Amino acid sequence: MSSLAAPQTGLLRQYLVLTKPRVTQLAVFCAVIGMFLAAPGMPDLSHVVFGTLGIWLLAAAAFAINCLIEQEVDARMLRTARRATARGTISDIQVLSLSGLLGGAGMLVLYHLVNPLTMWLTFATFVGYAIIYTVILKPRTPQNIVIGGLSGAMPPALGWAAVADSVPAEAWVLVLIIFIWTPPHFWALALYRNNDYIKAGLPMLPVTRGQQFTRLHILLYSFALLATTLLPYAIRMSGALYLASALALGGMFVWYAWRLYREYSDALARRLFRFSILYLALLFGALLIDHWVGLLR
């Protein structure tokens, strides 16, 4: 029995890696925040549960397709060379089947147990990431992250739609925050993984325009991000607690970007990349806490 279980466990682990669980977790977290912000009180828990499930399934399906399309590129990069698709230990048919199963299940869950709007928006996000970004933008332009960042910024709108069956201006403000956050987040990664991207032949900004140009644009985007995160307070979507959090977190982001601009090191770029993930989670957490505090007044 144990000899049979080991290969099955290994295959399941390979499938899980292809769905990029860490990235999926952050995306789904932002979607869930959108769900809770969409309701003046406690949202319909069935919509929260099934909305979360459906969005997670389609996100996982998109990431699996991404790994399939980029398997040759991944094989040339140290960071991704151990993926099953890059090593050839899992077939294209298996990945397509996995993605089709996850994506189909996600669409059924969202359509029948949440609402059609959320299903179509999530499907459009799937196409935007798996096809438009991965196939068209990423291998062709250094602005791939900027243009293609919209698909990665959509989770709050998807979550909002799951609860409210609409996507008002407040939801698009959250999308805008992630949209502005995306370039400095990925450019920091591209800086300290620059050799990987050169080997892979991908036109990331540090490859095409150089390190100094990229560092400057990370700094400029960090200021733009700080300004953008003040919008929820400006439109009275949030209160003083969120404002203080946005200023503190944004100030730290600018500080990291300024240090990276003044004196580059791979360690600083890696530190900014990791902080940017924590930054987004804390910022959206502050939005939710501020929302709940407002409900108690």
From Swiss-Prot:
Q: Where in the cell is it found?
A: Cell inner membrane
UniProt entry keywords in alphabetical sequence:
Cell inner membrane, Cell membrane, Heme biosynthesis, Membrane, Transferase, Transmembrane, Transmembrane helix
Chain ranges passing through the membrane: 23-43, 49-69, 93-113, 117-137, 144-164, 171-191, 215-235, 238-258, 275-295
Instruction: Report the catalytic activity.
Output: heme b + (2E,6E)-farnesyl diphosphate + H2O = Fe(II)-heme o + diphosphate
Q: Which GO terms describe its molecular function?
A: protoheme IX farnesyltransferase activity
Q: Which HAMAP family match?
A: CyoE_CtaB
Q: What else is known?
A: Carbon 2 of the heme B porphyrin ring is defined according to the Fischer nomenclature.
Write the protein's name.
Protoheme IX farnesyltransferase
Instruction: Please report the organism this UniProt entry assigns to the protein.
Output: Bordetella pertussis (strain Tohama I / ATCC BAA-589 / NCTC 13251)
